[in-house]
Amino acid sequence: MKSILSSFIFLFFMAHALSAEIILQNPKVNEKAPLFSAVNSYGEKINLADFQGQPVILEWSNHECPYVARHYEEENMQSVQKMAQEEGFVWLTIISSTPGEQGHVNPSQANDLTHSRNAYPSHVLMDESGEIGMQYGAKTTPHMYMIDDKGLLRYKGAIDDIGMGMKFFSASFANATNYVATQLSDVKLNNKLAIDNTVA
């Protein structure tokens, strides 16, 4: 899982050192998810607050990360995206790679990735400054967050239990416990989650 924190932390502090309004956060589950706004890959401004009343999934992504690449090459991520949207979730894919760093894309390239991978995000958000990533403490890709219709963060962490290292590339997604896919209904129904926090 590719670390994204180091690639944008310097730019973030440089951009916001003089702003008293920016607060670095690492939200806890069952607390309010930090609000944010960003421009999507089509140039539209997207506000998390606009989705109040709908459950939301945040997916931090870097197409050059080998973990992300395998999830998409084997259509595991697309399968979960489709399941989530069928359950009424808004799926926001967030790209926090800074210019010149691994995984950085411009909006047109982001759209090309979505189409070439047959992905199902509701929006792809461009977070070049890393501000949203800092708000959520997103450190790896894929890093997943589930937010319920009341705006509470219900889950954060890995997408599944395969783990990191070489075992990831030999393990079967079919035999893994997918923390997002298996808990869609519970988040939607505001039920207590069996697992709400894992290491991404």
Residue ranges and their predicted role:
Residues 20-48:
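N-terminal "domain-start" segment that seeds a small globular fold
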Residues 48-69:
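Short active-site neighborhood of thiol/selenol oxidoreductases, capturing the structured segment around
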Residues 56-59, 90-95, 123-126, 146:
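Structural recognition of the beta-strand scaffold that forms the well-ordered cores
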Residues 69-117, 128-133:
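Structural microenvironment flanking redox-active thiols in thiol-disulfide oxidoreductases
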